[in-house]
Amino acid sequence: LQADDTLMAVTTLSFDIAVLELYLPLWVGAKIIIAKKQDSSDGRRLLSLLIKHQANFMQATPATWRLLISSGWQGEPRLKALCGGEALPLDLAEELLQRCSELWNMYGPTETTVWSSCAQITQTQTPPGLGLPIANTQLYVLDEQLRPVPNGIAGELYIGGDGLTLGYNNRDELTRKVFIPNPFGDGQLYRTGDKVRYTHDGTLTYMGRLDQQVKVRGYRIELGEIETLMRQHDAIDDCALSVREVRAGDTRLIAYVVWKNSPISLSELREHLRQQLPPYMVPQHLEALGELPRTLNNKLDRKALESLPLSESSSLGKEEVRAATTATELKLLSIWQEVINKPISNINENFFDLGGHSLLIAQIIHRVEMDMSVQLKFSDLYEFADIESLAKKIDQS
């Protein structure tokens, strides 16, 4: 970042990577444009801001970059793009390289203060690497006995250096578990829980999580926390969650449930969870099972769970079914089915219960504008969250 650059800040202040957006421009004398929440969550409005202010530097999660691309962004030849918060998919890296001058893959957990490593991506024949550690930071790939593993062998990533925090406030047990004495020098190491390996050419690559903590659209989620709350519902005997990428860039939370007696609908389950969880932690799909898959040791077999096919309908309750009849309803039905990637038989079904989320809203808005010459706002999909009510809103306007 240089003094004559303009940085577009799109990160919420509660997300640690906002630190870079707030302070880096001050350090170098660059210009900063702070996007409002309604702008950063709406691809078209964010695109307008980028053009209006001629921003040439932006940091965002993969979900936000996809939001921008799905809203028709063709790129900016001067733009330096930083992508972090969760793994940078290969297909998104290819899209971004076509649209900007530089692409950087950023990696770092909150516990080590924003970023710990970075890699400039120049080609996309292989999945983007995590790069090299930033100044005053050390990266170690270790086995269960805290021994370095050879190149090509997977291990857990440990981070040391000046960026380490002191631990978790009022959570001494967790602090002792993940902040350990550095066996290779002074200070401590942070145990990330990330599975990585060095390839034979020295590239550090991300291979997933070693625990149940996952990231969905940039949010860090503990699956066990959601499962505990689900089991509190009277209708649920047992349950488990998994994260499934139903197609490139569209990652969803899947709830697998064993019912006690009578099943409930996905909308009922989501309403139960909404009272206790933020929206990004509420599952988008519900799959009923006779029993959860188990290993020989009678532990939950999450790999088997993730390999199960998703049913076409994820809602199990008895709900009023209404088919599309008007021209507007039929057109919206076609768009929704393509974007959500599943057949829809009931135009009264809620967009979010069908698996919708903010990234898909951007795609629907773009498709409606292209195919129907109608401009919608992000808030419209929250206020008119089924095809029937959205069609009426469009017809009345």
Name every feature range the model reports, one short phrase each:
Residues 24-26, 241, 286, 368-369:
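Short hydrophobic alpha-helical segments of the AMP-binding
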Residues 274-281, 340, 383, 397:
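A short N-terminal helical cap/helix-turn-helix that marks the beginning
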Residues 29, 85, 194, 202, ...:
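Conserved G/P- and acidic residue-centered "switch" motifs that form tight phosphate/ATP-binding loops
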